[in-house]
Amino acid sequence: MRINISLSSLFERLSKLSSRSIAITCGVVLASAIAFPIIRRDYQTFLEVGPSYAPQNFRGYIIVCVLSLFRQEQKGLAIYDRLPEKRRWLADLPFREGTRPSITSHIIQRQRTQLVDQEFATRELIDKVIPRVQARHTDKTFLSTSKFEFHAKAIFLLPSIPINDPLNIPSHDTVRRTKREIAHMHDYHDCTLHLALAAQDGKEVLKKGWGQRHPLAGPGVPGPPTEWTFLYAPRNEEEARVVEMIVEASIGYMTNDPAGKIVENAK
């Protein structure tokens, strides 16, 4: 009886609604039914990428979704020729073998495919690449926790080096926007990297298939500078050497090493 009364009451209320109100109500219910599974899957993907600058909860997911409204194109090369820096610190790279890996759709960049072998990562990459490269530049850099990825170890420009003089550090705007951060590796997750590259070096990296720009990197966007680049995880020792070359070039650009000092091999 109680169920019948409740249903009767519901039908009575619906009968008093206008056709427009009923259509709107049905539309909202239908849209919610369609959107909920999509949002649920997307939220699960957000959690699977692991720790980042966003909290690992629904609040962090909302932050990421809002920032995604500012997403930029990530693989075009023309943008680099519009930047003032024309020097290079990186030698010509070989083409990366195979196709590009699939990347998460969020602004938190992580690889979904072509994942690195865990044994190789433990032996050659995790807590090794970033410290090893930085150890060759202790006069200008230091290691600390990333300003972008709070679980990653990063290379920074020393605080004692001034960055407000373009004659001293031509990359001063890039250095300022990254808060002196040069490079970090997500070695707690998939061993991909983020780092700052001179425009022509970034162009070389993208052209040869080794990475892509950060989705928020670009002029007029509330994010990292255009030079902020995402590198795919190295899958073997040869690719690891190329990645170290690229990190070396990043340090050369951000510390204003002589432009003629082209990085060809990690030593």
Curated annotation (Swiss-Prot):
The gene is luz. Its main location: membrane. It is found in: Membrane. Glycans are attached at N4. It catalyses: 3-hydroxyhispidin + O2 = (E)-caffeoylpyruvate + hnu + CO2; 3-hydroxyhispidin + O2 = 4-[(E)-2-(3,4-dihydroxyphenyl)ethenyl]-1,7-dihydroxy-2,3,5-trioxabicyclo[2.2.2]oct-7-en-6-one. The lineage of its organism: Eukaryota, Fungi, Dikarya, Basidiomycota, Agaricomycotina. GO terms for cellular component: membrane. This is Luciferase. It is a single-pass membrane protein. Keywords: Glycoprotein, Membrane, Oxidoreductase, Transmembrane, Transmembrane helix. Luciferase; part of the gene cluster that mediates the fungal bioluminescence cycle. Uses the fungal luciferin 3-hydroxyhispidin as a substrate to produce an endoperoxide as a high-energy intermediate with decomposition that yields oxyluciferin (also known as caffeoylpyruvate) and light emission. The fungal bioluminescence cycle begins with the hispidin synthetase that catalyzes the formation of hispidin which is further hydroxylated by the hispidin-3-hydroxylase, yielding the fungal luciferin 3-hydroxyhispidin. Optimum pH is 8.0. Optimum temperature is 10 to 18 degrees Celsius.
